[in-house]
Regions:
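Active-site hotspot residues in diverse enzymes, especially metal/ion-binding acidic/histidine motifs
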Residues: 1-166
Length: 166
């Protein structure tokens, strides 16, 4: 699955869910698709998706920051929509260096970024906020507006070829 397919899929889900404002309400999207979310502290994982008997559950480590929890929910939604034939995914916390182990994990991360930071909205917001230059203050403002981490917004802008890699 290529990035364009993932972007298109995320955009279709946002449209179907009726998302018109920021930050993207990932929990409402999960609810619309009858996916239950359960939060609990856990030392070994950030999130997981379990499917059984036509039902789905996303588990989220609530000891992590809110922006991380939102990304985790979006990531697990990526598995739900992109990988329908696998019943369980567990995303372990030991992956601190950010290197994804499998293609499916990369796809779920791309989906999460596309869902939380829709490309058309983010490109428009970036152009508006950066017309007089772009610094850490503007990056912080965009991260706040989308309720994501500054790293997530930076990587998304770079991947959209809106911001140069520095």
């Amino acid at each position: 699955m290529i990035l364009e397919e993932i972007e298109t899929r995320a955009e279709a889900i946002l449209k179907k869910a009726g998302v018109t404002s920021l930050p993207v309400p990932v929990e409402e999207i999960a609810e619309k698709y009858q996916i239950r979310i359960s939060r609990a502290p856990h030392k070994d994982f950030s999130g997981m998706l379990i499917r059984k008997d036509g039902r789905a559950l996303i588990g989220v480590n609530n000891s992590e920051a809110e922006v991380r929890q939102r990304f985790t929910i979006a990531h697990e939604l990526g598995h739900f929509f992109l990988h329908p034939n696998q019943d369980a995914f567990v995303d372990y916390r030991d992956n601190k260096n950010g290197i994804m182990r499998t293609q499916r994990e990369k796809q779920a991360n791309m989906f999460a970024a596309a869902l939380l930071m829709p490309r058309k909205l983010l490109s428009k917001d970036f152009k508006a906020i950066a017309k007089n230059g772009f610094s850490d203050d503007e990056l912080h403002e965009l991260a706040r507006r989308y309720n994501v981490s500054e790293d997530a917004i930076r990587f998304r802008l770079i991947n959209l070829n809106v911001l140069a890699l520095s």
